[in-house]
Amino acid sequence: KTNAGKKNLPDSVKILRLWIDHGQAPVDDTYGYTVYTGKGTPSARLPFRVLRNDSLVQAVQSADKKLLQAVFYPGNNGLQAGGVSLAASEPCTVMIKMVAGKSVFTVTDACMNAALKKITLTYNGETIEVPMPQGEFCGRTASYELP
């Protein structure tokens, strides 16, 4: 009932809550999850490919290769998979979407480091400097279009 008393919002909504117990001390365990929205049973064939899923980089790419999403954690050594080479100078999230034949990059400094002025990406050998939002906009996404 978080919306109780607020105009134009429902008092309550149904949400998904999920708890998965991996035990007290899992060692060298690997797992991944896919959450689908909507009604019905999803296709057994995933609409994406997991490029990497470890403690340094998590990345997926759509089956049609028009969308790539990656999370780079501290100490990461970049991503080399699925015909893609992508590295980031700082921990961040990166989305690359193909739009009208151009690569559109959306980058977020998830750490909200106010001192961070830019994140440098290396994408298939090309260096891209993405200025990070400053001041009150720190933590917002920044976009860059590669012609």
Predicted segment positions?
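Non-catalytic terminal regions with compositionally biased, polar/charged low complexity
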Residues: Y36-P147
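Beta-strand/loop-rich accessory regions of lumenal/periplasmic or secreted enzymes
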Residues: K1-A25
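A structural signal for short secondary-structure junctions
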Residues: P10-S12, Q24-D28, V99-A100, M112-N113
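Short beta-strand micro-motifs in enzyme catalytic cores
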Residues: K14-L16, D29-Y31, Q58, S103
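Short Pro-Gly-centered flexible turn/kink motifs
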Residues: P26-T37
